């Protein structure tokens, strides 16, 4: 039994899971928050118990030391030698990385080179990698990229209709995100359908505060809704999704905002929050809509209709559809959104069973009996995907 740590490092946080492989069982999981600030918070859950500790954690290396000390101190692992691999989530791999990869100095340099494509995330991911390298220098580490799964997209999907030299010189193209999640749920769908993934055309809907749709044909991503950044595509919690690019100078002119301020508005004050004016949380919006709040109802309509359009579009891209998968916070838990997204698609063989659809947070087939297209709710598990890739590349 191999023990693998899956890591997701943020600028002031470190999310972790210790997994037993190949069983894929979680031994411990937790989070370090407020790294570099006063009163950092360390939370760990193991053996059915949760422990919380508040102390100053100056940097990610200190967070890693505290985590490892806690794992051994509580007897969760007998010694650090039990850890056979570390898998790091890295948001952006650019065109350089089309698969997960064992981290070497050269790889780390490559991740740093593409950091300008994800300035908010990659530097934090790199900090996490370096922190573990400092504390566990002899344990192999693997980088698992959110963008890698979408590197199979053809040029017809990833190129923008801009001067071609922008792509050649600056790497301006569609990259797509949530790749680790889309990969996990589409492979899981194939298992549940007892059909080789090579034979399937799957539409994957990762719907959380960030949301993206992927067309996965034969196990490969051939198109996805997010673009050069995670701002593109469908309406999200606080992100606008696709808009007319000419709106940016227009908004600047009307509001007096700078380009940076407009981009911040598109990222943090738009989407469901922008339309409702009160929340980016779908649960709040559904509750308000039930009580007759018109803007909440409009927000739900906009959110669902943007996703609905991709179902038809990507079914056309794949030459048909065998399954639709819903995952992430909203996809797994909101029967209302699933129903709205799938409404009126029976002409395509997509027919949701309203009774079966009344499911939250667990695997379930929710299509009507005999419907040609399977509709499946699958809770995502990016950590398991990270651990699988770590084992695949280090064993």
Curated annotation (Swiss-Prot):
Protein residues bound to substrate: 89
Any one GO molecular-function label of the UniProt entry: acetate kinase activity
Residues of the active site: 146 (proton donor/acceptor)
SUPFAM superfamilies xrefs: Actin-like ATPase domain
Enzyme class name: transferase
Cofactors required: Mg(2+); Mn(2+)
Compartments, record wording: Cytoplasm
Positions with a binding annotation for ATP: 15, 206-210, 281-283, 329-333
Gene3D superfamilies: 3.30.420.40
CDD domains: ASKHA_NBD_AcK_PK
Family under the similarity heading: Belongs to the acetokinase family.
Function of the molecule: Catalyzes the formation of acetyl phosphate from acetate and ATP. Can also catalyze the reverse reaction.
Subunit description: Homodimer.
Name assigned to this protein: Acetate kinase
Protein's gene: ackA
């Amino acid at each position: 039994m191999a023990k693998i740590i899956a890591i997701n490092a943020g600028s002031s946080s470190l999310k972790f899971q210790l997994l037993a492989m190949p069983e894929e069982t979680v031994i411990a999981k937790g989070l370090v928050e407020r790294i570099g600030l006063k009163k950092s918070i360390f939370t760990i859950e193991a053996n059915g118990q949760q422990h919380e500790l508040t102390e100053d954690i100056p940097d990610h290396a200190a967070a890693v030391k505290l985590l490892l000390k806690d794992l051994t101190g509580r007897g969760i692992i007998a010694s650090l030698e039990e850890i056979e691999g570390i898998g790091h989530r890295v948001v952006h791999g650019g065109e350089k990385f089309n698969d997960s990869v064992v981290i070497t100095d050269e790889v780390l340099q490559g991740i740093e080179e593409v950091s300008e494509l994800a300035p908010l995330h990659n530097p934090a991911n790199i900090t996490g990698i370096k922190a573990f390298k400092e504390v566990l220098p002899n344990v192999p580490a693997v980088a698992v990229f959110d963008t890698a799964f979408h590197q199979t997209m053809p040029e017809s999907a990833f190129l923008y209709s801009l001067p071609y030299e922008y792509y050649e010189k600056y790497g301006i193209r569609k990259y797509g995100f949530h790749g680790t999640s889309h990969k996990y749920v589409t492979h899981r769908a194939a298992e549940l359908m007892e059909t080789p993934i090579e034979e399937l055309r799957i539409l994957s809907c990762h719907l959380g505060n960030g949301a993206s749709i992927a067309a996965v044909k034969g196990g490969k991503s051939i198109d996805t809704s997010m673009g050069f950044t995670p701002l593109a595509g469908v309406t999200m919690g606080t992100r606008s999704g696709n808009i007319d690019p000419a709106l940016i100078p227009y908004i600047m002119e009307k509001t007096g905002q700078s380009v940076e301020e407009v981009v911040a508005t598109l990222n943090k004050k738009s989407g469901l929050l922008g339309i409702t004016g009160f929340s980016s949380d779908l649960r709040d919006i559904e509750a308000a809509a039930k009580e007759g709040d018109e803007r909440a109802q409009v927000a739900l309509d906009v959110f669902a209709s943007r996703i609905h359009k991709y179902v038809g579009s990507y079914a056309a891209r794949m030459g048909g559809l065998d399954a639709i998968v819903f995952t992430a916070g909203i996809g797994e838990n909101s029967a209302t959104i699933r129903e709205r997204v799938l409404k009126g698609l029976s002409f395509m063989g997509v027919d949701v069973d309203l009774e079966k659809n009344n499911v939250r947070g667990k695997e379930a087939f929710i299509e009507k009996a005999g419907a040609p297209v399977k509709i499946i709710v699958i809770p995502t598990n990016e950590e398991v995907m990270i651990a699988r890739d770590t084992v695949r590349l280090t064993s």
